[in-house]
């Protein structure tokens, strides 16, 4: 391998999805959280709380007090991902660099959640329950990836055992 050939102390971290407030807004997690925060702020400016009974819905928009807000548009909400937090993953990278011998590690949570699960948690954060959240978004085929991977999960066993690494931030 390259590191052995050149005598480099270089470890390789295979990092599964890791999220933070710095994540680009074109990623689904940020798209959802930005939309939810924007909707909550819009509703408050209308003098409304987020109770679905305060709104009317059509195919594309949500209406409250005569104003409209566009529904959240998403692609495949049945895709499962192994989502961790960036700070935890940076800690894993630091631990890799502290090792006497370089190695390759999978940095992941070992758990999967669907985009639908992420939506449910995000909407609950603004007091919209699971039975109502479907009114606020729509699945749009334009946002489907042409080569979507349905299920991604990493197994961090080696990193946990050899590095003593454990994620601190849960999905919730």
Task: Go through each PLM region and give its residues.
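Proline-glycine-enriched beta-turn/loop adjacent to the NAD(P) cofactor-binding site
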Residues: 16-19
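Conserved beta-strand scaffold in the Rossmann-like NAD(H)/NADP(H)-binding core
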Residues: 12-14
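Catalytic Tyr-X3-Lys helix of short-chain dehydrogenase/reductase
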Residues: 2-4, 36
């Amino acid at each position: 391998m390259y590191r052995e050939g050149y005598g480099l102390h270089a470890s390789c971290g295979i990092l599964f999805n890791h999220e933070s407030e710095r994540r680009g807004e074109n990623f689904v997690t940020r798209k959802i959280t930005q939309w939810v925060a924007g909707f909550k702020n819009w509703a408050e400016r209308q003098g409304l709380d987020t109770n679905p009974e305060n709104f009317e819905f059509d195919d594309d928009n949500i209406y409250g007090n005569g104003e409209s807000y566009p529904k959240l548009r998403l692609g495949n909400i049945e895709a499962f991902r192994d989502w961790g937090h960036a700070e935890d993953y940076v800690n894993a990278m630091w631990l890799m660099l502290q090792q006497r011998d370089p190695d390759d590690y999978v940095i992941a949570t070992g758990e999967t959640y669907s985009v639908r699960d992420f939506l449910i948690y995000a909407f609950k954060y603004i007091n919209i329950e699971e039975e109502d959240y479907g009114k606020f978004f729509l699945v749009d085929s334009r946002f489907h990836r042409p080569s979507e991977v349905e299920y991604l999960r990493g197994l961090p066993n080696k990193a946990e055992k050899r590095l003593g690494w454990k994620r601190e931030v849960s999905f919730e």
